[in-house]
């Protein structure tokens, strides 16, 4: 009998780690790893279902007669920032069917960026700029997801707790043309929703946005770097 040992999302392992659960496309590719306890047995068909936070089906691939261990999503538009779930079913050469547990993933592809850019009123090279927002929430929060881009690098805390162990976010790019952002989903469990004040803190440091080291100056011959400038922050919490 076949056993599904691992699900994959866009070529990466889908695990409990939040970063592994993010897709940046409306057509993610799901993959899986399977083993069999019978010699010569293998996958002859597969089926993938995707559901929203309510359990409503967004896509059912139906049974596909194939040995390939991947399928590309081809269903309804995926909601952004909300928990979605995927399940994979396999059919063996002997006709036995097995299904994986449902696993959570998120679509982090925002169709439009609504956040404004914040810059420090006074700038000092190699200083860490700290932005703080306090807010109260009354009533249950169903879903909460933070999208944040701090140039050059940012670090985020919610109610005194670091939301991620990463230290080099966001990914580097030519900021004059492209800015990447970090997706931090599932924050509804960390918000105080009884009217008590929440505190969101983002620290932003120079990174590659403003690098005045002698090495960089020597490497560029003193010419101005296109993407250089003051550290900036833009974020959306919804």
Q: Which residue ranges define each predicted feature?
A:
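Short, compositionally biased P/S/T/A/G/V-rich stretches that sit at domain boundaries
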Residues: 1-27
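Surface-exposed loops/turns
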Residues: 24, 80-81, 194
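Terminal edge beta-strands and adjacent linker/stalk segments
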Residues: 101-104
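Recognizes extended acidic, P/S/T-rich segments that occur
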Residues: 41-83, 93-97
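Accessory beta-strand-rich segments of carbohydrate-active enzymes
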Residues: 32, 71, 85, 92-93, ...
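Boundary/junction segments of secreted and surface-exposed precursor proteins
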Residues: 111-122
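Short amphipathic, basic-aromatic surface patches that mediate peripheral association
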Residues: 33-38
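Short, isolated positions in well-ordered beta-strands
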Residues: 14, 97-98, 163-164
């Amino acid at each position: 009998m076949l056993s599904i040992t691992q699900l994959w999302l866009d070529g990466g392992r889908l695990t409990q780690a939040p970063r592994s659960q993010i897709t940046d496309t409306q057509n993610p590719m799901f993959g899986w790893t399977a083993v069999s306890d019978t010699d010569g047995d293998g996958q002859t068909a597969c089926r993938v279902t995707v559901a929203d936070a309510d359990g409503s089906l967004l896509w059912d691939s139906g049974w596909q007669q194939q040995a390939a261990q991947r399928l590309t999503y081809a269903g309804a538009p995926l909601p952004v920032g909300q928990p979605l779930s995927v399940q994979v079913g396999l059919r063996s050469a002997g006709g036995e069917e097995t299904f994986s547990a449902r696993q959570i993933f998120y679509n982090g592809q925002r169709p439009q960026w609504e956040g404004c850019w914040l810059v420090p009123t006074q700038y000092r090279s190699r200083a860490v700029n700290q932005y703080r927002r306090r807010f109260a929430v009354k009533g249950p929060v169903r879903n909460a997801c933070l999208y944040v881009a701090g140039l050059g690098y940012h670090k985020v805390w919610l109610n005194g707790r670091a939301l991620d162990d990463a230290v080099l976010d966001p990914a580097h790019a030519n900021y004059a043309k492209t800015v990447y952002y970090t997706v931090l989903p599932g924050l509804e469990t960390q918000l105080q929703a009884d009217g008590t004040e929440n505190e969101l803190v983002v620290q932003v440091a120079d990174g590659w946005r403003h690098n005045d080291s002698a090495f960089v100056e020597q490497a560029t011959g003193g010419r101005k770097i296109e993407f250089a400038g003051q550290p900036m922050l833009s974020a959306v919490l919804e």
